[in-house]
Amino acid sequence: MYTAVAFQVASTINIKLSKQQLAHQLLFQDSDELFYQVAPEKFMYLFHYGIVSFFNMNPDETAQLIKEIEPYCVEMIPADMSEAISVHIVENTLKVDFEKVVLPEVNPEMIRLVMLNVSQSVALDAYS
């Protein structure tokens, strides 16, 4: 089992500067978001609206990466607002439940979509 977790860490994250400075493998980008592979089966997703999400990382790893992106954040916010979802890998299975997602494999694009959804959940909580 894996976990995807998202945090509201700032009012905004400078995506352009983050892209220029972060050394991780960039897998996806657009004007408002950056999706990185940090290590095998470990991913980080940054959003302009101050959300960062992580896949398959322990609290020490997430804390280190939050420190790494801090220079590109405007108005840091304590990472109290968060959302997490369990991700299970079961061959030939694709299923979404309330607190769990089942995927057929650790596929970066599928993981990105799970992380996008958990991040949007935090954003909705933050702005509601």
Stretches found by the model and what they are:
Residues 109-128:
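Structured inter-helical modules in multipass membrane proteins
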